[in-house]
Amino acid sequence: MTAHLIDGKAIAANLRKQIAQRVEERRQQGLRTPGLAVILVGTDPASQVYVSHKRKDCEEVGFISQAFDLPSETTQQALTELIDRLNDDPAVDGILLQLPLPAHLDASLLLERIRPDKDVDGFHPYNIGRLAQRIPLLRPCTPKGIMTLLESTGQDLYGMNAVIVGASNIVGRPMAMELLLAGCTVTVCHRFTKDLAGHVGRADLVVVAAGKPGLVKGEWVKEGAIVIDVGINRQEDGKLVGDVVYETALPRAGWITPVPGGVGPMTRACLLENTLYAAEELHK
């Protein structure tokens, strides 16, 4: 058996097409164009690439994108004042603060400063709290994108044993809440977990987001399981690999995401989806 590939690139492209169509419909109806403000502090190469992709995505779907490229020495106060201005700007539906930030800045305080209705990354404690209470509003982009990928498989998630490897605030923890909402029995594994292989081997669905290349071995994967690999790691030869050993997982899994081309494109597409939602439902 060879796993079915979950083509995140194609699914994300279709989602962007739907968003672009809706933006055009709004334009024809005389409604305001959705706006996204993107804040980048410093010159981290990976962050610069991510931000450039997000800006291109905005252009593709017809959003108004505001770019704020700030020097590394930008102060906490200056960033706070910028966020306050964007919070008050009616043309801005979403505010994206690109992480990581330089060490002298307190990311938690800055993320909390973003108005919850403009928190299109879904990181604000208010939005995480709503997800925990089963009344999600703006949902974290990567878990939201993963749920869209899972829907594309047509598999019924109710009653599945789901294992998440990695307990970050960005992926692991909100992913657990999303899967609980979907009716799964959820186990979250982390650096202190004993017998990781055993947990993975019992999973009908495994989501790996640990940032460690090759952490999950293919032979651990249960026959027919769904494997979602969030990891994206660059090797010395420049090749991008995930947190799962893809070559050995492929013949065992029922469904699997490739790296690259799996989860990453969906994260970006869901940022756009959240921004459109904010414009249409929260900023009427």
UniProtKB/Swiss-Prot annotation:
Keyword hit for Isomerase = no
For whether the record's keyword set contains Repeat, the answer is no
Q: Name one Pfam family in it.
A: THF_DHG_CYH_C
What residues does NADP(+) bind to?
166-168, 232
Catalytic activity, reaction form:
(6R)-5,10-methylene-5,6,7,8-tetrahydrofolate + NADP(+) = (6R)-5,10-methenyltetrahydrofolate + NADPH; (6R)-5,10-methenyltetrahydrofolate + H2O = (6R)-10-formyltetrahydrofolate + H(+)
InterPro entries named among the record's database cross-references: Aminoacid_DH-like_N_sf, NAD(P)-bd_dom_sf, THF_DH/CycHdrlase, THF_DH/CycHdrlase_cat_dom, THF_DH/CycHdrlase_NAD-bd_dom
Give the UniProt keywords, A-Z.
Amino-acid biosynthesis, Histidine biosynthesis, Hydrolase, Methionine biosynthesis, Multifunctional enzyme, NADP, One-carbon metabolism, Oxidoreductase, Purine biosynthesis
Give the EC number(s) listed in the UniProt record. 1.5.1.5, 3.5.4.9
Single GO biological process annotation from the record: purine nucleotide biosynthetic process
What GO annotations for molecular function exist for this entry? methenyltetrahydrofolate cyclohydrolase activity; methylenetetrahydrofolate dehydrogenase (NADP+) activity
Q: Which GO terms describe its cellular component?
A: cytosol
Identify the metabolic or biological route this protein is part of: One-carbon metabolism; tetrahydrofolate interconversion
The Swiss-Prot or TrEMBL record describes its family as follows: Belongs to the tetrahydrofolate dehydrogenase/cyclohydrolase family.
Assembly information from the UniProt record: Homodimer.
> Its biological function?
Catalyzes the oxidation of 5,10-methylenetetrahydrofolate to 5,10-methenyltetrahydrofolate and then the hydrolysis of 5,10-methenyltetrahydrofolate to 10-formyltetrahydrofolate.
Q: Which HAMAP family match?
A: THF_DHG_CYH (MF_01576)
Per its record, how is this protein called by name?
Answer: Bifunctional protein FolD
Gene source species: Pseudomonas putida (strain W619)
Report which gene this protein is encoded by.
Answer: folD
